[in-house]
Amino acid sequence: MPANRFNGFTEYGVGIGLRIPHYRHILTKKPIVDWFEIISENYMIDGGRPLEVLDKILDQYKVVQHGVSMYFGSASDPDPEHLRRLKQLVKRTNTPWLSDHLCWGSVDGRYTHDLLPMPYT
């Protein structure tokens, strides 16, 4: 198959996860990497060190977002506030794509904070 079978996906190269223990190294050493993956929910906040670091990273790198709490498989609709903050973060990062898990993890507004498998029904 040709390398472009993913409609440009491969043009983004190789990325690594942006995690708190790596902040200092990344900001001081400026490693050669194509992009960083952020966990969306860690940056869906109103200020603070994570957003300060994210803005510095965005000055030099592309960022892609990966979520861990959309719970597409739950019976409830997605939380409108979560979607609002997610949209706000997408605009801030100008991410080329956003991913999340196909799972469930909430019932009646109560969250398990786990990625539970979809039932085989």
Describe the function of each predicted region.
Residues H25-P31, G48-Q65, E81-P96:
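Acidic (Asp/Glu)-rich catalytic clusters
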Residues P2-I26:
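Boundary/entry segment of secreted carbohydrate-active catalytic domains
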Residues E11-I20, M70-D77, L115-T121:
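Active-site mouth loops of central-metabolism enzymes
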